[in-house]
Amino acid sequence: MSASKIPLFKMKGLILFLSLVKMSLAVPAFPQQPGAQGMAPPGMASLSLETMRQLGSLQGLNALSQYSRLGFGKALNSLWLHGLLPPHNSFPWIGPREHETQQPSLQPHQPGLKPFLQPTAATGVQVTPQKPGPQPPMHPGQLPLQEGELIAPDEPQVAPSENPPTPEVPIMDFADPQFPTVFQIARSISRGPMAHNKASAFYPGMFYMSYGANQLNAPARIGFMSSEEMPGERGSPMAYGTLFPRFGGFRQTLRRLNQNSPKGGDFTVEVDSPVSVTKGPEKGEGPEGSPLQEANPGKRENPALLSQMAPGAHAGLLAFPNDHIPSMARGPAGQRLLGVTPAAADPLITPELAEVYETYGADVTTPLGDGEATMDITMSPDTQQPLLPGNKVHQPQVHNAWRFQEP
C-alpha cells in the first residue's frame, strides 16, 4: 500500500467515527418512569410525539440548537442542553417566554408588599375562625384555602391544571446564571408536560439537526427524535443505513436516495418465493426454472419476450439510473433484455419505490398462451416433463399454483 493512500483511509475512518459520535450526542432521549400511562416500558428511552410537542415549551427544554454560539447543528448542543456548558447569555431573544411567566410567583412583588402583607397575614389567623363570609371563587379541582392563607390582590389568577407543579423543581430561567442540572431536567420530564392556558404552536420547541431520519424523510430537518417517527415500530432501534443514506456499505438500495424529497419511500421488499430469498435474482440465480433463466444464453434477443415489451418501459417505473447493472442479461449489441412489466400493471407501487427494486431482476413476462416453466417439487416425478435444452419458454410445463408473480 502506497503512502498516499494511508492518510486517506484514516481520514475516512475518522469521519465515520465522528459522524457516529455526533449522532449519539445530538439525540437527547430520557427514560420514562415505568407504569406511566402512554409511556414506553421501563428501560426504553422513548417519548411519544404529542408528549414531545408539549415538552418543547417546558421550562428549560426550549434551548434551541440554532441559537447556539457553537454553530448550527453542532454535536456540543446536547452538552449545553444538559447543563454541562455555560448558559447562553449572548443572545437577547433567549429569555422566559409569555407562557413561562404564568406560574404563580410573588418574587417580583415581594420587596414592596412585604411590610404590608405581614400584618394582614397575622390578623388573618385571628379573623378567619369568626367569618364564614364570602370566600374567593373556587375552581373545580382546587382545594379550599387553609387557615392563614390569603390571595395577593396583584397576583394573576391562574386556571388550575390537572397536574399542579410540585415545588421541588425550581423555575428555570435563562437570565439566571445558574443553569439547571441533568437531574432537574430529567425530573421535569418524568413529571410530564405542564398544561398551559394558551394553546401552544404545532411544533413549539423543536430543534433541527442536519440529517433526516424520520419515516417520511423530511427535508433534512427533524426535532426531538420520536419513536413514532423512527423507521420501525415503537421503541425499535434505528438503523445506521437510514441515518447515513450516503454510506453504501450500510444499505445498498439507499445509495441514490434523495434526502430533500417531500415523500419518503417504503424500503420494504416483499418476495413471495422462498427460494429467491436465499438465491438472489441479482446474482442470476432465481428459483429453478424461473423465466429469468429460461432465456436462451445463445439467443439473447428472444422474439417472445420482445413482443411483450411495453413502449417506453425504461422511462417508466423500473428505470435504471446508472444503466450498468451487471446482473442483467444483455444482447450482442450491449442492450438489456426488455421484458419489463409496464408501470400501469401494478397500481400499488409508487414512483418512490423504483429505486428499491432496481437491484432485482426485471419481471420477465410470458405470453398468455404459454405456461411457466417452473419446477414443482411437490408433484410426482412422472408428471414432470424432461427439460430440453434450447428456448424453454415455449415448452408447456406443470403450472405451479403456489408461485406468484414477484413484484
From Swiss-Prot:
Modified residues (Hydroxyproline): 42
Keyword Manganese among record annotations: no
Pfam entry (one): Amelin
Span of the signal peptide: 1-26
Modified residues (Phosphoserine): 48
GO molecular function terms listed in the Swiss-Prot or TrEMBL record: extracellular matrix structural constituent conferring compression resistance; growth factor activity; structural constituent of tooth enamel
InterPro entries xref list: Amelin (IPR007798)
Cellular compartment(s): Secreted, Extracellular space, Extracellular matrix
Residues in coiled coil: none
Protein name: Ameloblastin
Organism of this sequence: Mus musculus
Gene that produces this protein: Ambn
